[in-house]
A protein has these predicted regions:
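Long, hydrophobic/aromatic-enriched structural stretches that serve as scaffold segments
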Residues: 1-13
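Solvent-exposed, acidic/flexible segments
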Residues: 7-8, 27-31, 44, 48-55, ...
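Short, functionally critical alpha-helical segments immediately adjacent to catalytic or ligand/cofactor-binding
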Residues: 10-26, 58-61, 115-116
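Secretory-pathway/luminal and periplasmic proteins that interact with or process carbohydrate-rich
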Residues: 23-32, 44-48, 64-70, 83-84, ...
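Substrate-binding/active-site groove segments that recognize
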Residues: 33-42, 80-95, 115
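Acidic, aromatic-lined catalytic clefts of primarily extracellular/periplasmic carbohydrate-active enzymes
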Residues: 47-91
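Acidic, glycine-anchored loop motifs typical of Ca2+
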Residues: 96-105
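C-terminal soluble interaction/assembly domains
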Residues: 137-233
Length: 233
């Protein structure tokens, strides 16, 4: 994992965090035959085009011997391996790091390298901020607050949010010219035990994790666990 970190410039703590959250460090990668899963889901009218495309990509990967069809067991939705890659993600980002002529995402060498390559390709910046918890001066969701992961809106310079944040001075170590957004995973801000109104100020790296999984809570969890692992290592 250290070799992968150096080659792709992605923190090992982030890789460990993602693998822990996705598959409990490879202990549960799913038991579904993803070829059968994608074949079935391609007939689901709600997302037929998406799953049909994933199925065709998977068949092409098998046909060209890039992956071994005997190992293709994963989630009901067709995700596979320690980091739960869909076939399109395998096609675009997976790496045969140990050079054995197969991409095996249940092999740590290929899995770590593939995840690191994906993160590098979507723009993760090593040693850059992800998010910080803040307290707002009001508990009604204002127009600048993001509660949906579909697209973060109302991004501004950090300094432009100063009047809304109680503990703004605690952020004085951050460049106030950075573009940021404010999010809460809940539709309403719920005051905490101290009657404060918690939310999160998020940076560019946070949005990169949203490209991996379009969930505000998922991205918060990944960045939180990454920092915890870094503290413990």
């Amino acid at each position: 994992i250290n070799e992968v970190e150096n080659k792709y410039n992605i923190e090992k703590e982030l890789l460990l965090s993602l693998m822990g959250i996705e598959t409990n460090y490879g202990t549960y990668v799913g038991k579904m035959d993803i070829l059968s899963s994608l074949s079935t889901l391609s007939f689901d009218k709600r997302r037929s085009q998406f799953f049909t495309n994933e199925l065709l990509i998977l068949l092409r990967l098998i046909e060209t011997n890039q992956i071994d069809y005997k190992t293709l067991y994963g989630s009901w939705a067709g995700a596979f391996g320690f980091f739960q890659f869909m076939p399109s993600t395998i096609k675009n980002h997976a790496i045969d790091f140990d050079q054995d002529d197969y991409i095996d995402l249940k092999n740590p060498n290929d899995a770590y390298a593939s995840a690191a390559n994906y993160l590098n390709n979507i723009g993760w910046k090593k040693k850059s901020h992800c998010f910080y918890k803040i307290n707002l001066k009001e508990n009604n969701p204002p127009e600048y607050l993001n509660t949906s992961a579909k697209k973060l809106v109302n991004k501004r310079k950090l300094r432009d949010f100063k009047k809304f944040i109680i503990d703004y001075n605690n952020l004085n170590f951050i460049d106030d010219n950075l573009d940021v957004a404010i999010i809460t995973p809940d539709k309403d801000i719920i005051p905490d035990a101290n009657n404060l109104n918690p939310a999160y100020i998020v940076f560019d790296n946070y949005e990169k994790i949203l490209k991996w999984n379009r969930s505000l809570r998922f991205a918060l969890a990944v960045c939180t666990l990454k920092d915890r692992i870094k503290h413990e290592l």
